Amino acid sequence: MTRLFMLVCLGIVCQGTTGNILRGESLNKSLPILHEWKFFDYDFGSDERRQDAILSGEYDYKNNYPSDIDQWHDKIFVTMLRYNGVPSSLNVISKKVGDGGPLLQPYPDWSFAKYDDCSGIVSASKLAIDKCDRLWVLDSGLVNNTQPMCSPKLLTFDLTTSQLLKQVEIPHDVAVNATTGKGRLSSLAVQSLDCNTNSDTMVYIADEKGEGLIVYHNSDDSFHRLTSNTFDYDPKFTKMTIDGESYTAQDGISGMALSPMTNNLYYSPVASTSLYYVNTEQFRTSDYQQNDIHYEGVQNILDTQSSAKVVSKSGVLFFGLVGDSALGCWNEHRTLERHNIRTVAQSDETLQMIASMKIKEALPHVPIFDRYINREYILVLSNKMQKMVNNDFNFDDVNFRIMNANVNELILNTRCENPDNDRTPFKISIHL
């Protein structure tokens, strides 16, 4: 194995050497399936209402693709990109089951599924639940993932009451690249430091088409758009191949994840094998300047493109490995080098494009006295993105899955475990 040299200082992004990422001892461990679907259907309230939706084109099962998931208590949220035939973009999984799988129920109700006057949710591309029991929803405003229908916006719900707390439009000059005119808001990370005040909540939004990072301050509703060459896609890696089927993606920064331990925001361009991060301490004040922001990372450290990312409270970064249909990890207590990266799960059947991951605490079925030992579990959504892009789903097969696994068990006996002799997180050089 070739050891990767990396310099993390002076704002330098380093070049990685080649060599395969090691596969962990738990590679063949399958992720338990929580829910699965051949296709998505909804709880319309009555058969008559469902038939009306089908006849009018409001619902077409062939055009419903999940983009994100999250869980709060017994509610599991599923967002659907708004294509023609998608009746609701923000949903929860109901207790009813249809021919395709569990039925979806619009959240908080059907009124938010209507968007003709732009008052509802057009396309909930991503969502996040913070420690204050708030649901943050990123609405791209796009139909068919390309056509602007309404201005993009950020919505916040109180999960204890299901009431809308706030809705903020994202200005056009922030939401799109001023030079290219391109924009598609595709990833979301929320940093809530103090639940008693609004001033300590910041939101990070990735624009994968316009190759930009947007920082939102909840205290004054200010938006800042940042640019960096680390956000740009790499032309060498625009071909995405999953289970032998390929498509092209000329997309930049996406798949963001915020570390609760180091406050690093991790990301990768869609078309890239690199892994980058920026420390969010630099954004705490609203008077920061673009040229003062320092980005770190390693170019071409992965063997394939990466997708969704998430960081556990103990500092384990998980990421989807697109071409391998696998789940990779790296521990922030170790240096960001290739030999410290592991593949901990792989399945050509169930892990075709990991589209979303979330870290939650205490598996619901774990006895209360064991939850302090096995605190964290990971939720994983796979959605066969290649089938969506190429429009060749077989809806007689299972196409979409939500899986979960205990974090400690997943990384057991791999380098993603915390080193016994070092409990200090990987040090970062920050220049403010």
UniProtKB/Swiss-Prot annotation:
Leucine amide, modified sites: 432
Induction note: Moderately down-regulated by the ecdysteroid 20-hydroxyecdysone (ecdysterone or 20E).
GO MF annotation: an example: sterol binding
Tissue expression notes: Found in and secreted from the hypopharyngeal glands of the worker honey bee (at protein level); expression peaks at 12 days post eclosion. Expressed in the brains of worker bees (at protein level); found in antennal lobe, optical lobe and a subpopulation of Kenyon cells in the mushroom body. Found in the ommatidia of worker bees (at protein level). Expressed in the spermatheca of adult queen bees (at protein level); expression levels are higher in mated queens than in virgin queens. Expressed in queen bee ovaries and male drone testes.
Signal peptide annotation: 1-19
Note: Exhibits a growth factor-like action on primary-cultured rat hepatocytes by stimulating DNA synthesis and protecting cells from apoptosis induced by serum deprivation. Also activates mitogen-activated protein kinase, as well as protein kinase B, a key regulator of cell survival. Degraded proportionally to the period of storage, and is completely lost during storage at 40 degrees Celsius for 30 days.
Oligomeric and partner information: Is present in royal jelly in different forms: monomer (55 kDa), oligomeric subunit (ca. 287-420 kDa), and water-insoluble aggregates in sediment after interaction with fatty acids. Component of the apisin heterooligomer complex consisting of 4 copies of MRJP1 and 4 copies of apisimin, associated with 8 molecules of 24-methylenecholesterol; apisimin forms a bridge connecting two MRJP1 dimers. At low pH multiple apisin octamers stack to form filaments that increase the viscosity of royal jelly; these filaments may be stabilized by bound fatty acid chains.
Family as reported in the entry's similarity comment: Belongs to the major royal jelly protein family.
Entry protein name: Major royal jelly protein 1
Organism: Apis mellifera (Honeybee)
